[in-house]
Amino acid sequence: QKDAAAYKTPAAIKGKQVCAQLGTTGQLKAEEISGKKARTFNNAAEAMMELRNGGCDAVVADKPVIEYFLKESRQSRYFHELPTQLTTEDWGFAVKKGNKKVLNALNSALVSLQKDGTVAKIHKKWFNN
């Protein structure tokens, strides 16, 4: 928080030491923006704690993961979150080829959850500040 003014855009981490979760798109994006190899950790919470302890200048991770960490850990007073989204990603379920029964059940359930507002309620509960 004390140096929040120095980090208003992603470009501010150019040349800085950035932490990220190992093997994630956050790691790739951190290295792309900073121009340096990211310090990696098994999970985003470990990366956030390294930031708090001064071991890096920034953390790049999935927005919902960061928001959840800040909410649940009660550590938000130590961090400044940029409003900028660095990437977007699509997610899906893998279903064994030819298993139309499971595929159709998943697709049907997802559509139902979106239509009845369940997805929006879950998102609001877990990810809206």
Could you describe each region identified by the protein language model?
Residues 1-129:
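Proline/Glycine/Serine-rich low-complexity intrinsically disordered segments
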